Amino acid sequence: MEEDLIQPQPDSETLTSPTSEVGAVELVEHEDDERVEQDPGYVTPPKDGKESVPVSPLTEADYLGGEDDVLLKHVLRQSTIVQEAFKDYSGFPLTVEELSRTYEANLFSPRVPPKKQANGTCEPNPRLNFYPVFAVPEALATYHIFFKNQRIPLSCRANRTQGDRILHLKAGAHIPEIVSLEEVPKIFEGLGKDEKRAANALQKSETENQNVLVELDGDNARLAVLKRTIEVSHFAYPALNLPPKVMRSVMDHLLIKRVEPLDSDQPEQNSEDGQPVVSDDDLARWLDSHDPTTLQERRKMMMAVILVTVELECLQRFFANPQTLRKIEESLHYAFRHGYVRQACKISNVELSNLVSYMGILHENRLGQNVLHCTLQGEARRDYVRDCIYLFLILTWQTAMGVWQQCLEERNLRELEKLLVRNRRELWTAFSERTAACQLADLIFPERLMQTLQNGLPDFVSQSILQNFRSFILERSGILPAMSCALPSDFVPLCYRECPPPLWSHCYLLRLANYLAHHSDLMENSSGEGLLECHCRCNLCTPHRSLVCNTELLSETQVIGTFEIQGPERQEGASNLKLTPALWTSAYLRKFIPEDYHAHQIKFYEDQSRPPKAPLTACVITQSQILAQLQAIQQARQEFLLKKGHGVYLDPQTGEELNTPSPSAAASCRPQKHAAQREQASHCGSAVPKATETARAVGRGGGILGRQPGRGSFRRGGNGELGKSRRGAGGQTPQGRGGRNHRQRRGTVFQRTRSEPASDGESRTVPAAARLVESQP
């Protein structure tokens, strides 16, 4: 292609900058076609000796250009993108549908994956600037566009005034389980005897009363407004079925043969269409019974296994895995900017909640919202959080099913059909419905496939993504989101006994979402002031990532950026350690103790009487002795600056004055020797070999957030030992203000004001604890 697209970096980091989004695409033309502007102060003389005709400058009326209209660049860029989309297309599409499909495939499903930036995210794609804003691309909605349109049960969540109380989970609650039709043979879809219609309910005639939502006494404010706003009888439930290719093979080789279109040329091939795969004679021989009732019950059981139970079994195997539950809760902490993710954002000063991903590709989207739940309280907050997690589970499962569907080829389906035929008798003669479902799940959803999908899922999402998904579902159901306050989870029953079997998968995901909301401590706000600002009671945060419970971690955060441990200068392989916010945050995000994570039970640390199974340690400096020595050095330095120092000292972080001496105190200052500080400095100097050895063991470690300079370091004295004067071993003759010592001291973090002189005695008796932090020249 003759022309390429580039995207220059915006001049400003703010989203309101005009160069950040619009107009960021520039077209690189050939050098022959480029117009080079000359300096108006000097004109190059023509080579042929003839004077060139001067070009009239652009006036105010035609500042957009004459022959080379700048507005044509927009059309040129768009035509370049369209030309690239049809570069490998045989022939030109004749319909709008073919044009849209090819254009979207080039934008969202390119042959070459997007390049990664240094921070791990994908680089911005300028080709997307011409795609309709806020439109859902059909190329991306491979599995998310399928729905199960079904009548809303009268026993749905919206018609249960005590739904919030029923869904409340206490400490010790376990993860929800699945059921089978043998365990729940009868279904109740009524309103219930405990529910009473509201006295002020709108009266409607029987012909007009097609609304499933009933106004009840005890409805919360949101549901009361919802029931007076809309009238619905059916809802588009997102599809949770197994891939169609798999289900077609299972139906054709286990239950009933699919009916194909009639072929008049070969009528013998159409004779078995629509017939059961297993005849009555074969089934009677396998079961050793000719009772018609027994045979009919067995056929009902196999139909329930294929249509309902095996789907529930695959859902439970995928989501109930401890590693998957941990990753789901981590994604929820990012989506709600909660717990340890909020703590990491605060210390690193990087908004980690801007990271989103899809199918393993990481993106940075600063337009997403992650604090919308903070505007709600009480039952409204719990309903919103529960619905967000419910949609997140649906989105994760649909993504997995889409990947599974796209990977299957004819060769794989033929092998699957062989397995089904080989195990047909074993499946039909299984002990129970749950046993048959487990055996069938082992065939169609093997362990290798499940682990592969679990390794790539779930994705990082934001609340804005879930809100768009919510609006997409409601619009497909004929509900206008702007005029109602409906949630998709309002139309799902709360228990299997009140839910029709085709919706059992949605009932399981709603119950699982409620469990995850309680297990992640998202239902209530447990944070407070001070150290409790980012507190979360879940097993991912407390006690190992909590600054309240882990004192070693708190001590480590207090020495971030205050020191640098240097190894021997001439020794090969010597490593230094500087605890920067980026290094600490990377280690903090990776810190996970599986022994104290209870995936299948709500078991908060504050509700336990026993100590944690693993010791509470810091992230980078895991030895408490080294951490205590660093904290003692920092404390000694601060005490010296506040009590014995002269002049005005500034805080390295806030710039505030740490001590402001009065005129009388400044006049009475005399050179004094501080034996206590010397003792402290010599004691700290003996700990350096041990600290240097620890620095090599810990290593510097790579950080995903980039490196940031520290604010202090350990440096050697004149003879290579800490605690000694930099002017030599004895520190005899002090130098004046113009000497080398003053030039080194002038660049420290705690600077002396020029208006206050320093005496020679003071320069001689500065303790080592204060000189160890002079890392910035």
Swiss-Prot record:
Q: Any keyword Chaperone?
A: yes
Q: Phosphotyrosine (modified residue): where?
A: Y334, Y649
Give Gene Ontology CC terms: host cell; host cell cytoplasm
Q: Which UniProt keywords apply?
A: Chaperone, Eukaryotic host gene expression shutoff by virus, Eukaryotic host translation shutoff by virus, Host cytoplasm, Host gene expression shutoff by virus, Host-virus interaction, Inhibition of eukaryotic host translation factors by virus, Late protein, Methylation, Phosphoprotein, RNA-binding, Translational shunt, Transport
Q: Tell me where in this chain the RRM domain is found.
A: 317-435
Its PTM note reads: Might be cleaved by the viral protease. Phosphorylated. Tyrosine phosphorylation enhances preferential binding to tripartite leader mRNAs and allows ribosome shunting.
List all Gly residues biased stretches. 728-738
Q: Where is this region: Disordered?
A: 1-55, 261-283, 652-777
Q: Where is this region: Binding to host EIF4G?
A: 250-314
Source organism superkingdom = Viruses
Q: What subcellular locations does the record give?
A: Host cytoplasm
Q: Where is the composition biased (Polar residues)?
A: 9-20, 656-665
What Pfam families does the record tag this protein with? Adeno_100 (PF02438)
Where are its TM segments located? none
- Compositionally biased, Basic and acidic residues: which spans? 753-763
The induction comment states: Expressed in the late phase of the viral replicative cycle.
Gene Ontology biological process: intracellular transport of viral protein in host cell; symbiont-mediated suppression of host gene expression; symbiont-mediated suppression of host translation initiation; viral translational shunt
**What is the role of the protein in this entry?**
Protein that inhibits host translation while promoting late viral translation by ribosome shunting. Blocks host cap-dependent translation by binding to eIF4G, displacing MKNK1 from cap initiation complexes and preventing EIF4E phosphorylation. Binds to the tripartite leader sequence of viral late mRNAs and recruits host eIF4G, PABPC1/poly-A binding protein and 40S ribosomes subunits on viral mRNAs, allowing ribosome shunting and efficient translation of late viral mRNAs even though conventional translation via ribosome scanning from the cap has been shut off in the host cell.
Q: What is noted besides the main data? A: All late proteins expressed from the major late promoter are produced by alternative splicing and alternative polyadenylation of the same gene giving rise to non-overlapping ORFs. A leader sequence is present in the N-terminus of all these mRNAs and is recognized by the viral shutoff protein to provide expression although conventional translation via ribosome scanning from the cap has been shut off in the host cell.
Q: What's this protein's family per the entry?
A: Belongs to the adenoviridae shutoff protein family.
- Subunit comment for this entry? Monomer. Interacts with hexon protein; this interaction allows chaperoning and trimerization of hexon proteins. Interacts (via N-terminus) with host initiation factor EIF4G (via C-terminus). Interacts (via RRM domain) with viral mRNAs that contain the tripartite leader; this interaction allows ribosome shunting and expression of viral late mRNAs.
Query: What is the name of this protein?
Result: Shutoff protein
